Amino acid sequence: MKPRLCFNFRRRSISPCYISISYLLVAKLFKLFKIH
């Protein structure tokens, strides 16, 4: 999901943006835990 899609989506469909952002954050945390 590119950041541009988030800006394209309006208040009606903001959920997909949050889902993509949360997914990236979870992936980063998962990698950090794997390293440690």
Curated annotation (Swiss-Prot):
Keywords: Auxin signaling pathway, Cytokinin signaling pathway, Developmental protein, Ethylene signaling pathway. Mostly expressed in the embryonic root from the heart stage and in the seedling primary and lateral root tips, especially in the columella initials and lateral root cap. Also detectable in aerial parts of the seedling, sepals and leaves, principally in vascular tissues of the lamina and petiole. GO terms for biological process: adaxial/abaxial pattern specification; auxin polar transport; auxin-activated signaling pathway; cellular response to auxin stimulus; cellular response to cytokinin stimulus; cellular response to ethylene stimulus; cytokinin-activated signaling pathway; ethylene-activated signaling pathway. The keyword Isomerase does not apply. Disruption phenotype: Defective in root growth and leaf vascularization, characterized by more anchor roots at the root-hypocotyl junction. Cells of the root meristem and the cortex of the primary root are short and more radially expanded. Reduced meristem cell divisions in meristems and reduced axial cell elongation in roots. Enhanced ethylene-response, hyperresponsiveness to cytokinin, defective auxin transport and homeostasis, and altered microtubule sensitivity to inhibitors. Induction: Repressed by ethylene (ACC) and cytokinin, but induced by auxin (1-NAA and 2,4-D). The keyword Coiled coil does not apply. It comes from the Eukaryota. Belongs to the POLARIS peptide family. Required for correct root growth and vascular development, probably by modulating both cell division rate in meristems and cell elongation in roots. Negative regulator of the ethylene signaling pathway that modulates microtubule cytoskeleton dynamics and auxin transport and homeostasis, and possibly cytokinin signaling, thus influencing root growth and lateral root development. This is Peptide POLARIS. The gene is PLS.
